Amino acid sequence: MAITKDQTGKLSAQVYALVRACPKGRVTTYGWLAGAVGYPRGARMIGWIMSATPANLNVPAHRVISKEGVLTGSKAFGAKDRMRTLLEEDGVSFEPDGRVDMKRFGWDPRLDLNPDELREVLDSAQTLRVNPPDTLLRLLNDDPASPFKLSDPL
């Protein structure tokens, strides 16, 4: 099942709306976001979408980390430790090994929002206009790890 550019834009907007809903002082994961938009095995897809985040949408992308509490997207923030600094400014603290305590700071939209709140956040994505890059569309359609590629019949 291929995904169109329009569908990619709508999916990206839902992801960005969820990240914008993540409260200051909390973090979420690629996997939790993937599950919230209906693709529980799509964590890598969320990483691709996050790497294409338009600056004008004011998405607090620094709040998206790995399920282990590791700052896997930190290279996207330029200066070394910039992602960590942004999280610390949000009120997130770090363990001695540099990880975030996910039990303390984790925010899973499927658990921390009731179904009506989750639907409201996803519906709010309609106000976000996202023009995804062609590279994202190619990844979603062609990469073996894409949930859209995985759903193709053998």
In which residue ranges do the predicted regions lie?
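Nucleic acid-binding interface residues in structured DNA/RNA-binding domains
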Residues: 2-154
